[in-house]
Amino acid sequence: LYTDLRNRRLIWNKETSTLLTPISYHYFEDSAPNPRPLRPVHRVKGRSICLWNGGAAENYFHWMHDVIAPIALASDQGVAINFDDYLLPWSSSQFQTETLQQLGIELRDCLSYLKFNWIDAEEVSFISSTRFGALGCHFSKPAIESLRALWIPESNQSGERLIYITRRDAKTRKVENEEEILSFLEPLGFEAMELASMSVAEQASLFQSCKVVVAPHGAALANLAFASPHCHIIELFPPNWVTSLYANLARTVGCYYLSLI
């Protein structure tokens, strides 16, 4: 994203989520190891807002917590989210469309900057991240509350369901001995759930209804934002990857958390 901002020349690097200023669009052309003509700049008139703070655009977790949660918090704090264009890493997926509509953002006003290398905006605003700390593993409680309020009006309602979130529908990190896990859990009353085909509203309702959630590490646990306080979370990790991301999200909501490797 490039904008003159009245000749002050500001660059937003979408790969590293950093602001670089004052440098010009041609900085990248001149400094490249093998200089080559840059793709044309896409001009955007009026007031725009860039709604992105890092992560993978197509990933459910990053979309919910790096795009939607900051907008929801800003709106709840009285900031008018009313712009001519919304610059997003938008790929028209079902959950992206549903969440934008829930926020009252018209899809016709959304501009996916994934389609352009360079955007020149007359006036552009940025929204701050609501995650902080090392690797963004800590969450703003007000932001989580604003996110919950979009789909869970009564946030303290408790649930009784026991669920296991399967990754059978995932492209990566499948659980090799999942049938063995299910043979242990199902007699205890656990239901195996695939979330990919569910709407955000359905996923939020599901997590609110749970007493215990067992799940391999993955984006589906972004829905812990909708879990009832005192829900028990058991996260399963592979031996080569452990993170405190969902442990901190669970604690922010008020859930009990345990991990197994």
Pin down the residues of each PLM region.
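The feature primarily captures lumenal catalytic ectodomains
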Residues: L1-I261
